[in-house]
């Protein structure tokens, strides 16, 4: 079973934001967007602190948008 974690309570220091930010999923039951985060599959894309910077998200982006658009502070 996949765990859906709140962005506000999640610590993301165990992974690299730049490498993982663009891996998207969608929780259709809640109509919200989620980010794949290594061993803990999904965290809310509303925004969370990642190693080396913050990943900030507003609306659900097309998958064609480059990864740099997803990771604040990571070109």
From Swiss-Prot:
Keyword match Signal: yes
Q: Origin organism of this chain? A: Treponema pallidum (strain Nichols)
Q: What is this protein called?
A: Uncharacterized protein TP_0059
Keywords from the UniProt entry? Signal
Secretion signal, residue range per the UniProt entry: 1-18
């Amino acid at each position: 079973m996949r765990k859906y974690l709140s962005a506000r309570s999640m610590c993301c220091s165990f992974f690299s934001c730049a490498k993982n930010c663009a891996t998207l999923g969608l929780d259709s039951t809640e109509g919200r967007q989620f980010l794949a985060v290594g061993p803990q599959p999904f965290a809310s894309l509303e925004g969370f602190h990642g190693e080396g910077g913050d990943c900030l998200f507003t609306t659900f982006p097309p998958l064609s948008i480059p990864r740099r658009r997803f990771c604040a502070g990571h070109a």
